[in-house]
Amino acid sequence: MKKINHWINGKNVAGADYFHTTNPATGEVLAEVASGGEAEINQAAAAAKEAFPKWANLPMKERARLMRRLGDLIDQNVPEIAAMETADTGLPIHQTKNVLIPRASHNFEFFAEVCQQMNGKTYPVDDKMLNYTLVQPVGVCALVSPWNVPFMTATWKVAPCLALGNTAVLKMSELSPLTADRLGELALEAGIPAGVLNVVQGYGATAGDALVRHHDVRAVSFTGGTATGRNIMKNAGLKKYSMELGGKSPVLIFEDADIERALDAALFTIFSINGERCTAGSRIFIQQSIYPEFVKRFAERANRLRVGDPTDPNTQIGALISQQHWEKVSGYIRLGIEEGATLLAGGADKPSDLPAHLKAGNFLRPTVLADVDNRMRVAQEEIFGPVACLLPFKDEAEGLRLANDVEYGLASYIWTQDVSKVLRLARGIEAGMVFVNTQNVRDLRQPFGGVKASGTGREGGEYSFEVFAEMKNVCISMGDHPIPKWGV
């Protein structure tokens, strides 16, 4: 059986203990994975600390060259990495192969260029004084990445972190360890020096906790659940943090919207990536005048989505990450019905028409709950699965109030042709990102992140460097400015 070890200081390091990672679509054991803890984290942090001075002082152009080389290697291995990601996560192969893994390659290409444009500023005070700033790496960084789009998210952290001159310890979710192992291997193949990128496998409560608490770690970039993020900030001490946490993103569809395009986008935003995405438009608010027709058409199309083998290019909904997560999502569907929502598509049970080799898989049909009240738990709590909650609203004021009436504030989506309404809502909605008349279309130059319980800090473009860089001010006197004379 395949064994997944740690990558520490350029070496493939065996673990003292191992656990199994399984294919969520079939139940098949894919590999034995090293279960790291404090000892492995100490080794990795020490390696990163030792590698930091030389890496930080490497000419920026040389670091950029190595980043581009790593991006090229990923690009050359997209089919292999995509197949690995699909097997480990249950994500449909058409998404991993055509979108998510190519994005990972682009992350290195993009940040190789952006890091070379990071410059300090000068502040001439007068003819006697000059201030200027230096942009410098922070040192050893903890990168903690989630299971839902593991390879892309990991590279989104690794690329800006390393490009700026930091070194890193990457800890992936124990539910999706395979592609992180491949990333560690490709980094060495690209020529990135030993110790610059270390990959420690293991559980959050052991390896993850030891990593974020480590005294040599200067910055933590975490993507995951809100409860875990709060615990990290509470327990890890005085460090720099970037926290991309949970979401319960609203979609506001007004009666003057392009309904066909709004339907397309609303379905995609909640059901792509199996609904396991932080920016999922899981609360879909529809203006009362168009509510009945929109709900009918939305449910009809949800019922036609193809659920099945993630390796089939025609599959749109694959398997949820684990049996435990399946039970959580299924439980929320039952809860929504108990709370009074109307089930129009899907349901809490596995599809009955799965082929024999998928019977043990964690499959759920895309589920539509209509007539949801915004105070129901299914409308307030992050489900993180293919479950859409449909709610009516009367007018702009009520739509905005309902959209904001939740603890999260990551993404938001607005559908209207009224430009004045767009400008008012974009200012008033409590979210880190607002998408108008579109699904979530990302540009790497834009800031990605949320407000309220959805996190702190931003990733993307130069904003990624906020957690990975220190701004140092230098003040220089030209020689004869006045200095107070004390003790004369």
Regions found by a protein language model. Give the residues of each.
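Hydrophobic face of amphipathic alpha-helices that form TPR/SEL1-like repeat modules
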Residues: 1-25
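N-terminal alpha-helical segment of soluble enzymes
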Residues: 24-89, 289
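Conserved C-terminal structural/oligomerization subdomain of aldehyde/semialdehyde dehydrogenase
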Residues: 26-32, 217, 252, 306, ...
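Short, well-ordered beta-strand elements within core beta-sheets of diverse protein domains
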Residues: 29-36, 51-57, 143, 251-254, ...
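Long amphipathic alpha-helix in the N-terminal Rossmann-like dinucleotide-binding domain
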Residues: 46, 68-79, 93-118
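Rossmann-like NAD(P) dinucleotide-binding subdomain of oxidoreductase/dehydrogenase enzymes
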Residues: 120-261, 393
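A short hydrophobic/small-residue beta-strand
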Residues: 167-169, 343, 433
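ALDH superfamily catalytic-core signature
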Residues: 227-373, 436, 483-484
